[in-house]
Regions:
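FAD-site-proximal beta/loop scaffold in flavoenzymes
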Residues: 5-28, 101, 110-176, 180
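Rossmann-like NAD(P)H-binding beta-loop-alpha module
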Residues: 20-56
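Active-site flanking residues adjacent to catalytic metal/cofactor-binding acidic residues
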Residues: 35, 59, 156-157
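Conserved Rossmann-like nucleotide-cofactor binding loop
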Residues: 40, 64, 121
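Rossmann-like dinucleotide-binding cores of NAD(P)H-dependent redox enzymes
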Residues: 44-92
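A conserved short coil-to-beta-strand element within the FAD-binding core of flavoproteins
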Residues: 90-101
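Short strand-coil-strand connectors
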Residues: 105-107
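C-terminal, flexible cofactor-proximal segment of oxidoreductases
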Residues: 174-237
Length: 237
């Protein structure tokens, strides 16, 4: 209760613009709470940390941030956050939120601006489709290995439950897969196969963590790797 009424969300560019506008109005040492420390929340914390202006609180129901990364990279993130005096509240689920206060089961924290980066509720359209077709999923429209939920109907990205974590990397690959199938008029019978090309997260002070199935990087070299990856993505995609 109170999340929709009292929090900003970070899902779209429009959301990001609104957050930026609100941050500009805050006084020095204002209390900014970031709820959800996955990729989105952790990168936001890294960017806020760089401003050296806010008192930041990182909140998550799990035992730490970025649980999709290995333990070493998680610890590097925590070390950087602790060095910068970020208030860390983990293993704590939000009970309800009121103006200026976030309540947990046995605790509470005050805020001037709260940004929700936790799980995003399934869209009304996805809910409606699942209900009409008797599909059961809380993540999105339940699709088969061809990303179909009916013979000539497909779903990808955040609106689809394809059994893969809904990242931008996954959504891009899904889009390319369907584009290829549309272009060849579905003559092949190839199922969608997600290829994990690695995970990257900016954590603040020109430090990033990066890992794939071959290597794991952190710190300044992780940031350099991230800069190179972003360059090649813009240049060749």
């Amino acid at each position: 209760p109170g999340v929709k009424e009292n929090c900003l969300f970070l899902k779209t560019k429009k959301d990001a613009d609104l957050i930026y506008k609100n941050l500009q109005t805050l006084e020095p040492n204002a209390k900014v709470a970031v709820i959800g420390c996955g990729l989105t929340g952790s990168e936001l914390i890294g960017c806020l940390l760089d401003k050296k202006k806010f008192n930041i609180t990182a909140i998550d129901g799990l035992s730490g941030p970025l649980q999709m990364f290995n333990k070493s990279n998680i610890n590097k993130t925590l070390d950087l956050w602790k060095t910068n005096n970020i208030n860390i509240i983990f293993n704590s689920f939000v009970k309800h939120i009121e103006p200026s206060t976030i309540y947990f089961k046995d605790n509470k924290v005050e805020y001037d601006l709260a940004i929700w980066c936790g799980g995003v509720k399934i869209s009304p359209l996805s809910q409606l489709i699942n209900k009409k077709l008797n599909l059961e999923s809380r993540r999105g429209i339940l699709v088969n290995p061809y990303l179909q939920f009916q013979k000539n109907a497909f779903a990808i990205g955040d609106c689809a439950d394809a059994g893969v974590f809904p990242t931008a990397q996954n959504a891009t690959q899904q889009g390319r897969y369907l584009a290829q199938r549309f272009n060849n008029k579905f003559r092949d019978d190839q199922k969608y196969n997600y290829q994990d090309k690695g995970k990257l997260c900016y954590i603040g002070e020109k430090n990033s963590i990066f890992e794939n199935k071959f290597i794991s990087l952190h710190g300044k070299i992780g940031y350099l790797a991230g800069t190179i990856i972003h360059y090649f993505n813009k240049r060749f995609n």
